[in-house]
Amino acid sequence: MSFIHDDFLLDTQQAKVLYHEYAKNMPIIDYHCHLPPEQVGQNKQFRNLYEVWLAGDHYKWRAMRSNGVDERYCTGNASDWEKFEKWCETVPYTLRNPLYHWTHLELRKPFGITDRLLDSRSAKRTWDECNELLATPEFSARGLMTQANVKLVCTTDDPIHDLAHHKTVAADKSFKTAMLPTWRPDRAMMVEDAESYNKYLDRLAITADININTFDDLIKALQIRHDYFHENGCRLSDHGLETVYAADYTDSEIKAIFLKIRAHKQLDAVEIEKFQSAMMVEFALQDHAKGWVQQFHIGAIRNNNPRLFRTLGPDTGFDSIGDHNYAKPLAKFLGRLDDQNKLAKTILYNLNPRDNEMIGTMIGNFQDGSAAGKIQFGSGWWFLDQMEGMTRQIEALSQLGLLSRFVGMLTDSRSFLSYSRHEYFRRILCGIFGRDMVKGLVPDDTHMVGKMIQDISFNNAKNYFPFVVPE
């Protein structure tokens, strides 16, 4: 039997039935990812397995560095084959890391490789077989999405993005997967460095075709772009936060703080926190007015290696889990919005697993009966996007909320091969329920439980998000 087989992770008969008869064939809504829109718009044909699988993958780079692989083979100038070969040499050392499971799931689907484990001995054969498939239309960017039964993806986009590739995809009626933008306005509140912030404001001003001299101008410029995103199908925002900002402030303070930084003067720590607190509220009010869903990814500390950040830049594998205490500011932020009846549907993702129960109870404070699961505890994110992390999130939500209303999995990935993460999640979910059924913790009723599995896999997301999912 191959390592990744039909019943992988399904250790009870009930789990096998739940997965094969209920979960496996459900379509995918990938409502948060980092796919490059231009690759979908241009229907990119990948030249080789490195380009589709390793390029830009900081998960793999971290593992390779930990295995003693020189940076030349991660982000450097080695050839594509050399980089792939070094990855294959590393794979056997990733046992018990989710990379080992992901790697072999991704070789199984879509490449159909189940007869080998990836290592230095199987590298060349795997390289040649996959590259041959990648030259075919079925393995283009869009072809891979179609193979994975992806109905809709939401990319992650800055307010200054022109969304040209989203328009291209929307206009092509032959492609049955929708690609929608997600509003990610983080840079509009990154006021720690006055010079870089002003450069961003200048670009935003050009894009919005408005002068940005005052705080009101900034909000108007963002509203112009928010409207533009809405016109092009955007129905979600996303915000990457080291912690939650909920300081007290007055309108006059924020206007004065903005004038100070627009004059290229550095803000102090108190001013930064007040401004970021105000921007979080402004973002949330714009989203509520449009009926969008807002997402908050909370708790990453980024670019922790100064030397390699200077050399390689962001998103290259030098981020980690933070340890901020943000329960009170989060409650204060959500309460500010709820007090005005302007709290949009919200998904909260924590990066530190110690916060699972805090988030699991926090969401219950702001459920108001207007929508099932209005406030969501998001799936295990980033470093928690693995078997233990996803299981702990599922367990916390089960005990403290309604798992039955959970909107389920997302890839959070830059790769077109990452849709196997939905399969991984579904297998884990079915395994949990199968064991519960055997133990008598839930009824041994596969139809009842199977419907819930299908809801978490697809139906809940389809019903929760305010976009139209293609049939």
Swiss-Prot record:
EC number of the protein: 5.3.1.12
Gene Ontology biological process terms, A to Z: D-galacturonate catabolic process; D-glucuronate catabolic process
Pathway participation: Carbohydrate metabolism; pentose and glucuronate interconversion
Reaction catalysed by this enzyme: D-glucuronate = D-fructuronate; aldehydo-D-galacturonate = keto-D-tagaturonate
Cross-referenced InterPro entries: Metal_Hydrolase (IPR032466), Uronate_isomerase (IPR003766)
Family to which this protein belongs: Belongs to the metallo-dependent hydrolases superfamily. Uronate isomerase family.
Gene (name only): uxaC
UniProt-recorded Gene Ontology molecular function terms: glucuronate isomerase activity
Keywords: Isomerase
The protein's name: Uronate isomerase
Organism from which the protein derives: Cellvibrio japonicus (strain Ueda107) (Pseudomonas fluorescens subsp. cellulosa)
Matches recorded under PANTHER family: URONATE ISOMERASE
